[in-house]
């Protein structure tokens, strides 16, 4: 029986609560409130109603028939978290935590964001619940994700650009935690992934677990069996934990995909489990990318949502026990997979999700037709069009020109 975390917030060797004394009481208050409410029928009814009526759950399970034909191997199914309100899985957790904050009497939300999807989700639920919202976002990510920055402001949130470090997700999280330490009386810190001190990895998993539960039931209805392999991208790892949680005790192969950036043998990657070592980041013991002196090495990925130097402690545990296999995909491989899905199925995935797709395509090609691969499509790619234009505009124009020439 899989029963993690334990009472100390540990997933095997990983997790825990490595925070200053000033945060111990706020964390204990959040844990107490969550444990009281998570099985409360009234709370669950309110949460489920929001998921159904506001976010649009359950999300679809799509058989990618044209893509499957083109690759010529196993059947590929997509769990469509891109169809959620706000365009990604992040809203699942944001709605749950906002409801929790409201029940605790908090009036203001704090959030960190990388790709901007959690920031948008936090700003969205703040508007819905009549709460104020402040979002910390690295300057580099503000530049990469200007569309989401504008969306957050349009929703009434204050967006604070963070210039320290590399100006990415790690730095935004640092600043969000610092701000929370000073304002924890009336502010609720809404962490966006299965990272941070206990109870956050547990809370976020519980507010994302419907991804796997829905997908498992939907897949069984279509195939009268379980998928052979389940694939999801991993930055902090909330969409992956949400997907994997329903299959942990089943005989299904689980594969998490990290960002290899320019290659795991270069300094430019965010492959935490592939290349990292044990350490503490943002209050949790996990794997992280660090040098021999314990200094964090700045991660890199084309994807703003995957360039985090740590990983959720449950993923660290699942890696250590061997239950989940963790692999990595480069920027170029992810962008190629994004183009292939877009061109064959008319679905534009987020660059984060494209990392999972690239690995899934590689796996599917090597399997016979009767096998199946289920992929968590964690979000849509509208937010990435600006980045893709920079990377692909010349390539796409050349392809179109070639097609015109061929027609003549």
From Swiss-Prot:
Q: What is its EC number?
A: 4.2.1.20
Q: Cellular component terms, GO, for this chain's entry?
A: cytoplasm
Catalysed reaction(s) here are: (1S,2R)-1-C-(indol-3-yl)glycerol 3-phosphate + L-serine = D-glyceraldehyde 3-phosphate + L-tryptophan + H2O
Keyword annotations for this protein? Amino-acid biosynthesis, Aromatic amino acid biosynthesis, Lyase, Pyridoxal phosphate, Tryptophan biosynthesis
To which pathway does this protein belong?
Amino-acid biosynthesis; L-tryptophan biosynthesis; L-tryptophan from chorismate: step 5/5
Listed cofactors: pyridoxal 5'-phosphate
Q: What class of enzyme is it?
A: lyase
Entries under PROSITE patterns matching the protein = TRP_SYNTHASE_BETA
Modified positions (N6-(pyridoxal phosphate)lysine) are 90
Q: Supply one GO molecular-function term.
A: tryptophan synthase activity
Quaternary arrangement and interactors, per the entry? Tetramer of two alpha and two beta chains.
* Family the entry assigns: Belongs to the TrpB family.
Query: What role does it play?
Result: The beta subunit is responsible for the synthesis of L-tryptophan from indole and L-serine.
What is this protein identified as?
Tryptophan synthase beta chain
Gene symbol here is trpB
